[in-house]
């Protein structure tokens, strides 16, 4: 396991255990961290679902936001930035008990903006569940 992966695991432990919104991600497991790429997994549980028993769109958006931000922290600059724009395209449902893989890529990082893409896929079938794009302002 790389030191980057180990360091990020420690950050995630703290983030997901303190009071606040990030606790909704406490079931997310970090698989690997590399410069500009992060892979996580999560088993869909009842607490993650909408009334139809599928992964809630709001949680999907939170995964896009948080996992892409952590991927940005794995770059040389290491700045998490603040969100400027985010969009998510929902393509297929994820049901209770299904394992999903969340893969974030940093597409470009400039002086003030960074651009990321995030794919959520079914771990068993590889089917694309959702795809997100996230633009972050990095400051001056």
From Swiss-Prot:
Expression across tissues: Highly expressed in the kidney and moderately in the heart, liver, brain, small and large intestine. Also expressed in brown adipose tissue.
InterPro entries: ACOT13, HotDog_dom_sf, PAAI_dom, Thioestr_dom
Example of a GO cellular component annotation carried by this entry: mitochondrion
Keyword terms: Acetylation, Cytoplasm, Cytoskeleton, Hydrolase, Lipid metabolism, Mitochondrion, Nucleus
UniProt modified residues of type N6-acetyllysine: 27, 37, 43, 108, 127
Binding site for CoA: 46, 83, 90-95, 108-113, 137
Binding site residues for substrate: 50, 81
N-acetylmethionine: residues bearing it: 1
Enzyme Commission numbers on file: 3.1.2.-, 3.1.2.2
An individual GO BP term: negative regulation of cold-induced thermogenesis
Subcellular location: Cytoplasm, Cytosol; Mitochondrion; Nucleus; Cytoplasm, Cytoskeleton, Spindle
Chief location category: cytoplasm
Record PANTHER family: ACYL-COENZYME A THIOESTERASE 13, THIOESTERASE SUPERFAMILY MEMBER-RELATED
Function, as annotated: Catalyzes the hydrolysis of acyl-CoAs into free fatty acids and coenzyme A (CoASH), regulating their respective intracellular levels. Has acyl-CoA thioesterase activity towards medium (C12) and long-chain (C18) fatty acyl-CoA substrates. Can also hydrolyze 3-hydroxyphenylacetyl-CoA and 3,4-dihydroxyphenylacetyl-CoA (in vitro). May play a role in controlling adaptive thermogenesis.
Self-association state and partner proteins as the record states: Homotetramer. Interacts with PCTP.
Protein name: Acyl-coenzyme A thioesterase 13
Organism: Mus musculus (Mouse)
Gene field: Acot13
